[in-house]
């Protein structure tokens, strides 16, 4: 009888890719294991369709992809942003139940576990109906995971209203961080007084029911955070199995990628600063102009992934930028040293020898990718847990320089503008070998550690072996 794991990823590109690549890793490491991935359609992230098609075009043995029936987007897009994915999975419960029912009726299959993205943990209700063990996948780092559990504990056990931390100078003593953490670096949703924080807190309560939490990180990157969570008897066992990355670039637009990489081929080694802010990383026009002026004044070559703003309620991400957002004459004046694009093949760009620095929103996947390729980072977090990731990269790990950690851009409502002078200064600091050699050295060392972690007998390799012992 074959052993089957069911994976339920959130249909946002970074979340989905991480879980599918993890499924491939599991299969490669255990010959008696198969994985079925259940994918929901999500109207905002168009990159998912391309990635999905690439998976179906190149099937992997023992990996089954099932596309769940589409849900009317009005049933979840009208919810507050933090509730979109929990609402989506609530509407998919019937379909997940049908899949699990068919699988349990098969005499040749034994479901050994259901692994759900942390935003989909309410699906545990369905797993419980079939007495299937449940596991959580955290696409964010262990530091953030520790903060989330800490806030949930403060709220539930200490009766602390965590929304009072909003706009406060409070510093939190979070077990997963060696340094005091400014409370304002918590994801804004945790601090909202309109009840939205309850949605997030409920997810982390539910996480505690799981038999284990699988995290896309590795021991050498977050030793303090990982050890702190393992010492907490109220938190399920932690399994760091990363870095898990989309190294083959499935789902990318090969024609656009070829043009971008061709331009990089013509640039000197380590001469280009790459700016990319994730799927939802867009700026209002006044901030775009400040970035443009800062880049021009820095004198460095640059590759800038610039996306137009997305408004609340929009159902599709826009991948192209408008020249109208840029300062007059900017493209002409910088034509010899720049390339401004919409979508970017981020992994391939970071791997290119022409790139010498990365200005990033500090989404956790981007953090892992920068470490894997030994790329120094200048942090510019925008939303979600990114402020905390930036704090961890700069203050805890010493792997990045800071452009701005206080910037927040929720649907482009930020009134705070980072000025061109500061952008110019920080880009020069990022790209200058002299003043920044310590960070470059640490990043290169962590690059080697990340690869050792995934190799035989490495920390993540061993952690996955322990997980298999638990599951099988």
Curated annotation (Swiss-Prot):
How the protein is affected by changing residue 338 to G? Gained ability to transfer a glucose residue to the C6-OH of protopanaxatriol (PPT)
> Which pathway does the protein contribute to?
Secondary metabolite biosynthesis; terpenoid biosynthesis
The record lists the catalysed reaction(s) as:
(20S)-ginsenoside F1 + UDP-alpha-D-glucose = (20S)-ginsenoside Rg1 + UDP + H(+)
Enzyme Commission identifier(s): 2.4.1.366
Q: What protein name is recorded for this chain?
A: UDP-glucosyltransferase 103
Q: Which residues bind UDP-alpha-D-glucose?
A: 344, 346, 361, 364-366, 369, 385-386
Q: Which family does it belong to?
A: Belongs to the UDP-glycosyltransferase family.
Q: Where is the active site?
A: 15 (proton acceptor), 117 (charge relay)
Instruction: State the organism of origin.
Output: Panax ginseng
Q: What keywords does the record list, in alphabetical order?
A: Glycosyltransferase, Isoprene biosynthesis, Transferase
